[in-house]
Regions:
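Extended interfacial segments that mediate partner engagement and assembly in macromolecular machines
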Residues: 1-54, 58, 133, 138
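A short glycine-rich, Lys/Arg-flanked "PGG" loop and its adjoining helix->strand segment in the class I
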Residues: 102-117
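Flexible, glycine-/basic-rich loop-and-beta segments that form/coincide
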Residues: 170-186
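Conserved S-adenosyl-L-methionine
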Residues: 159-170
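Short, glycine-/aromatic-enriched active-site segment of Class I SAM-dependent methyltransferases
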Residues: 118-143, 147-149
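A conserved beta-strand element that flanks and buttresses the S-adenosyl-L-methionine
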Residues: 87-90
Length: 186
């Protein structure tokens, strides 16, 4: 299931990215690297960030370059200095865990190439409420999202939503795609 989802996610990201092979692909909270594997198999340079040292070791053993660190603007600046900006950044179901959500997003904005694409997957609060999914509310989730608040948060750091996709993960999630340039409506 995760492997199928990772392939679909890969294809959706590539469709939305120009010059995707330039620079590198960054996943925040990359776990064992499952969602970076399709990029690796297709010749992309990838970097995963995950705070769990044991999981980062597994990812590296599976061919996914992974740093065992928490994501924040300090990590972003260090990575930017070493590797330059990322062409693609994605963070799946991790934003709700961030203690300092503004610093987390600031780090993504700092690390994203000027022509890059950011994809953030979050459990959608609308799905939780509509489906009465009270069992989806966890103590480690510090927030839940609808589109407007996440869009406002991204805008504060010069990131602009250009597409949204529904995901069936966790009983209903949204994937928000953003860029540094505001796309004018026609």
């Amino acid at each position: 299931m995760a492997r199928d989802s990772s392939t679909i996610f890969y294809k959706e990201l590539i469709k939305r990215t120009l010059k995707a092979r330039e620079n590198y692909v960054l996943e925040i909270a990359s776990n064992d690297g499952t969602f970076l594997q399709p990029f690796v198999k297709n010749g992309y340079k990838v970097i995963g960030i995950d705070p769990a040292k044991n999981i980062a070791r597994i990812a590296r053993k599976n061919g996914v370059s992974t740093r065992a660190e928490f994501w924040n603007s300090k990590t972003a600046l260090s990575l930017l200095k070493e590797q330059g900006p990322a062409r693609i950044i994605f963070a799946r179901n991790v934003l709700a865990h961030a203690a300092d959500i503004r610093d987390f997003v600031k780090g993504m904005a700092l690390s994203l190439h000027k022509d890059g694409v950011l994809a953030i997957e979050v459990h959608y609060a609308g799905a939780i409420l509509k489906g009465l999914q009270y069992d989806s509310i966890y103590h480690e989730h510090l927030c839940y999202f609808t589109l407007k608040p996440i869009e406002h948060l991204l805008n504060q750091f010069g990131l602009y939503v250009f597409d949204i996709m529904a995901s069936s993960i966790s009983g209903g999630a949204i994937i928000v795609y953003a860029k540094k340039q505001k796309i004018e409506e026609k």
